[in-house]
Amino acid sequence: MKKPLRQQNRQIISYVPRTEPAPPEHAIKMDSFRDVWMLRGKYVAFVLMGESFLRSPAFTVPESAQRWANQIRQENEVEE
């Protein structure tokens, strides 16, 4: 009998965005993307939620970071 590939009752770990007052000083804004900044060679999205920014995990491509930001906006229905 073969073993199942993944553990059945394992909890799914989801990313909880860090809250920051602003993107860090050394982050470089990517002009072609609304929420994407370059940080230590990776792409990070910062989405303004009320008084603070939510920070995405680091991505290797800016499109992924922007997609994350769009999803966060949709989930929280942020209106401009």
UniProtKB/Swiss-Prot annotation:
* Keyword hit for Cell division: yes
Matching InterPro entries, A to Z?
A: CedA-like_sf, Cell_div_activator_CedA
The record ties this protein, via Pfam families, to: CedA
Highest taxon in the source lineage? Bacteria
Q: GO: which molecular function terms?
A: DNA binding
Keywords tagged on the record: Cell cycle, Cell division, DNA-binding
What's an example Gene Ontology biological process for this entry?
cell division
Say yes or no: keyword DNA-binding present. Answer: yes
Free-text function comment from the UniProt entry: Activates the cell division inhibited by chromosomal DNA over-replication.
Similarity annotation: Belongs to the CedA family.
Q: What name does UniProt use for this protein?
A: Cell division activator CedA
Organism, as annotated = Escherichia coli O1:K1 / APEC
UniProt gene name? cedA
